């Protein structure tokens, strides 16, 4: 069984060259690895110069491609199977978040999660079940797994920004609205940004919104 000691991946910053005062974990999607999102870090670092960025490779080899990693399998996309996969990976990610926090001597309020696709699903599932609220979550092109369970399992309520393209051919655009409704129903503050014509990707406007959101969350922390 993988554990948080098995997770590694590229890192960036702090841009200031000083001791990290904030931490952002970037969680990639299915079939990618940590190198997929670490390229976002320099853009975010312009607004967050004292922030360290870590982009771990997901714990499991991708079973739908000859390369890449996955947080959980999507060969069977039934809600029950997806939930079981998320629940299996959740303790690994949860322990990794805590280990990275402790390594830098930070508190939960000093860290944020940024996810893409599967990384968004994992971010939302894990962060909202941690006993202490992190500073915030940015979720690109993702979904909320098991929304019917959230209200009964939520332990903390960090603010969330969801960004999704309305031409997404992988994760339906409607997933953003469904996630927002469930999050709001559980008392979580949610901002949403729809990107016209954008497929399963992240664009400049989405990056800019993420920078503004995390700057606000981490500065207020």
Which residue stretches match the model-derived regions?
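Short N-terminal helix/helix-N-cap motif within the alpha/beta-hydrolase-1
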Residues: 34-35, 148, 203
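Alpha/beta-hydrolase-fold catalytic nucleophile elbow
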Residues: 56-57, 114, 138-141, 163, ...
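Short, proline-enriched alpha-helix->beta-strand connector loops that line the catalytic pocket
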Residues: 109, 155-160, 186-189
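Short beta-strand/loop motif that positions the catalytic acidic residue
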Residues: 162-164, 168
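Conserved alpha/beta-hydrolase "acid-adjacent" motif
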Residues: 169-175
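C-terminal catalytic histidine-bearing segment of alpha/beta-hydrolase fold enzymes
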Residues: 177-221
């Amino acid at each position: 069984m993988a554990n948080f000691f098995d997770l590694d991946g590229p890192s960036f910053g702090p841009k200031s060259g000083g001791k990290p005062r904030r931490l952002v974990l970037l969680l990639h999607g299915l079939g990618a690895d940590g190198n997929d999102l670490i390229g976002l870090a320099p853009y975010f670092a312009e607004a967050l110069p004292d922030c360290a960025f870590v982009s771990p490779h997901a714990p499991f080899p991708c079973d739908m491609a000859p390369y890449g990693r996955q947080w959980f399998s999507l060969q069977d996309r039934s809600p029950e199977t997806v939930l079981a996969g998320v629940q299996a990976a959740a303790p690994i990610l949860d322990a990794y978040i805590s280990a990275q926090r402790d390594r830098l001597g930070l508190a939960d309020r000093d860290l944020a999660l940024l996810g893409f696709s599967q990384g968004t699903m994992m971010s939302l599932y894990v962060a909202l079940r941690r006993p202490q609220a992190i500073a915030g979550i940015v979720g690109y092109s993702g979904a909320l797994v098991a929304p019917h369970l959230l209200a009964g399992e939520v332990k903390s309520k960090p603010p969330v920004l969801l960004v999704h393209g309305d031409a997404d051919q992988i994760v339906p655009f409607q997933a953003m609205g469904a996630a927002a409704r469930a999050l709001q129903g559980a008392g979580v503050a949610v901002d949403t940004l729809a990107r016209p014509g954008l497929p399963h990707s992240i664009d400049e406007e989405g990056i800019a919104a993420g920078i503004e959101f995390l700057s606000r969350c981490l500065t207020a922390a």
